[in-house]
Amino acid sequence: MTIKVAINGYGRIGRNVLRAHYEGGKRHDIEIVAINDLGNAATNAHLTQYDTVHGRFPGEVSVDGDAFRVNGDRIRVLAQRNPAELPWGELGVDVVMECTGLFTSKEKASAHLRGGAKKVIISAPGGKDVDATIVYGVNHGVLKATDTVISNASCTTNCLAPLVKPLHEKLGLVNGLMTTVHSYTNDQVLTDVYHEDLRRARSATMSMIPTKTGAAAAVGLVMPELDGRLDGFAVRVPTINVSLVDLSFVAARPTTVEEVNGILKAAAEGELKGILDYNTAPLVSVDFNHNPASSTFDATLTKVNGTLVKVSAWYDNEWGFSNRMLDTAVALAHAR
């Protein structure tokens, strides 16, 4: 069954979802039928074709009246502020990828259902009212046919949860603290400007900027047995893409570097293949740009002192997450 997908909001994630679909050789039976964005269609086509972070799109993108042509496929382009007024029913949309960052609760995202869509995936942490928060590869099996609005969590939770799952299963995670060393994003500023968060008011290009994140705590939404056991914060740094999760945790029993690395290597080669990668080379952040994995565990950085464990994982915070949006869309559409 071909799953008809619409993208609402054509920013960093919206564009990368489309690119990932085509650059991945349409590995899923998905048809992107529409894009809704208030921006000029010609500008959005140009930004799809040419990207500072991910390079030139290896295909053709053009504007054809009220549509994009992407490698010959016609994708309807809309510019409607109110999701409830979008023609999702007319277009037969199965899943809307809600990528604006504006409709992040079930109540708000349900406007797409009133427009005729069957399901919605929010490309951000959702409110407590969403039907499920999903990290593909970790808990997508909980999806049910009755789920209509779900969250794809955050890029950081998508990196952290695949690390935590096998470690908790094999060692037991008592509690832990995470720092994400995170590239700057569009919710920061180029030069100092007023912001309620005084640190986020400062230039993203000039400083390391500590700020809050709910990514660690959100693991409890994905793995309820860990609810309340993880916390952390982010340090935004002056790089444009790729981030690093640094997790320190107390294990239920003493362990070793070799055992920890072995657990994650087995997971990367087994149940989490394609979601969790395993790295042993002395690499830096740019080497993981455009990597489709949610998380790349760096075995060279593991430290252990009895029951105290530190592990690290790289992630392309744009590309990996966008690939998981596609995976989750298929899982949601096929949920029974």
From Swiss-Prot:
The active site is at residue 155. SUPFAM superfamilies: Glyceraldehyde-3-phosphate dehydrogenase-like, C-terminal domain, NAD(P)-binding Rossmann-fold domains. Signal peptide: none annotated. It catalyses: D-glyceraldehyde 3-phosphate + phosphate + NAD(+) = (2R)-3-phospho-glyceroyl phosphate + NADH + H(+). D-glyceraldehyde 3-phosphate binds at residues 154-156, 185, 200, 213-214, 236. The keyword RNA-binding does not apply. GO terms for molecular function: glyceraldehyde-3-phosphate dehydrogenase (NAD+) (phosphorylating) activity; NAD binding; NADP binding. One of its GO terms (biological process) is glucose metabolic process. Pathway: Carbohydrate biosynthesis; Calvin cycle. NAD(+) binds at residues 12-13, 37, 81, 123, 186, 317. Pfam families: Gp_dh_C, Gp_dh_N. Its EC number is 1.2.1.12. The record marks 182 as: Activates thiol group during catalysis. Homotetramer. Could be involved in carbon fixation as a component of the Calvin cycle. Catalyzes the oxidative phosphorylation of glyceraldehyde 3-phosphate (G3P) to 1,3-bisphosphoglycerate (BPG) using the cofactor NAD. The first reaction step involves the formation of a hemiacetal intermediate between G3P and a cysteine residue, and this hemiacetal intermediate is then oxidized to a thioester, with concomitant reduction of NAD to NADH. The reduced NADH is then exchanged with the second NAD, and the thioester is attacked by a nucleophilic inorganic phosphate to produce BPG. PANTHER family: GLYCERALDEHYDE-3-PHOSPHATE DEHYDROGENASE 2 (PTHR43148). Belongs to the glyceraldehyde-3-phosphate dehydrogenase family. This is Glyceraldehyde-3-phosphate dehydrogenase, chromosomal. It comes from Cupriavidus necator (strain ATCC 17699 / DSM 428 / KCTC 22496 / NCIMB 10442 / H16 / Stanier 337) (Ralstonia eutropha). The lineage of its organism: Bacteria, Pseudomonadati, Pseudomonadota, Betaproteobacteria, Burkholderiales.
